[in-house]
C-alpha cells in the first residue's frame, strides 16, 4: 500500500516539477518568508540544477524524484518557521502545497529510515555554493538573485520538462531508489 500511495502522489509532483521549481524561486524572493527557509530554498534550487542527484545511481525522472522529495522537506520546514508565508504561497500554488502532508506521510511510509539520507542532503542546502554563488547570497544580493533566477529558467528549458508518459513509465520502477538509499543509511 505505501508504495502505491507514494507513486500516486509523486506522479503529479514530477509532472509539474518545473512549475514547482518556479514556486520555490518565488519563496527565495519573498521577504515575508524567514531567511533560514529562503536560504534552504535557494540551496534546494542549486542542488536541483547542479548536482547529480540525492539518490546515487539513478537517472532521468527518478533522479529528479529525489529532488522533488528534497523540496518537500524544505517546504515542511518552511511551514513550521513561516506559517503565514507558507499559507500565502499555498494560495498561489495550491497544487504544490496542499498535498504536502500526504506526500510527506507517503515518503516516510515508503522509504522508512531511508528518509534520513534525504534529510542529510537537505541539511547542507544553506551552505551550497555554485560558480561562486552561495545560497545565502541568493536572498541578499541582487546579482546572485538574478543569477539564480536565470539558472533555474535555463534548467527548465534545457532539462526539466517531463512528459506524463515518461513519469508514469519510470515510476513503475521506483523500487530502484531503495537500494542506493539503504546503502547510504548503512554508512
Predicted features, each with a name:
Residues 1-19:
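Polybasic, low-complexity association/targeting segments
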Residues 25-28, 49-52, 75, 79-82:
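A structural signal for well-ordered alpha-helices, especially hydrophobic packing surfaces
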Residues 32, 59, 79-86, 115, ...:
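Long, hydrophobic, amphipathic alpha-helical segments used as structural scaffolds
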Residues 61-92:
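Membrane-interface alpha-helices
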Amino acid at each position: 500500500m505505501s508504495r502505491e500511495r507514494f507513486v500516486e502522489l509523486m506522479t503529479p509532483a514530477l509532472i509539474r516539477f518545473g512549475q514547482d521549481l518556479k514556486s520555490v524561486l518565488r519563496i527565495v524572493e519573498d521577504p515575508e518568508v524567514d531567511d533560514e527557509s529562503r536560504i534552504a530554498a535557494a540551496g534546494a534550487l542549486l542542488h536541483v540544477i547542479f548536482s547529480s542527484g540525492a539518490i546515487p545511481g539513478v537517472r532521468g525522472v527518478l533522479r529528479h524524484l529525489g529532488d522533488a522529495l528534497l523540496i518537500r522537506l524544505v517546504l515542511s520546514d518552511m511551514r513550521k518557521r513561516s506559517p503565514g508565508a507558507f499559507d500565502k504561497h499555498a494560495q498561489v500554488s495550491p497544487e504544490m502545497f496542499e498535498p504536502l502532508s500526504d506526500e510527506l506521510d507517503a515518503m516516510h511510509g515508503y522509504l522508512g529510515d531511508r528518509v534520513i539520507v534525504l534529510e542529510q542532503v537537505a541539511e547542507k542546502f544553506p551552505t551550497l555554493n555554485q560558480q561562486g554563488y552561495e545560497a545565502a547570497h541568493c536572498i541578499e544580493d541582487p546579482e546572485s538573485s538574478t543569477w539564480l533566477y536565470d539558472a533555474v529558467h535555463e534548467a527548465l528549458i534545457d532539462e526539466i520538462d517531463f512528459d506524463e508518459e515518461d513519469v508514469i513509465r519510470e515510476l513503475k520502477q521506483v523500487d530502484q531508489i531503495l537500494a542506493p538509499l539503504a546503502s547510504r543509511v548503512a554508512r
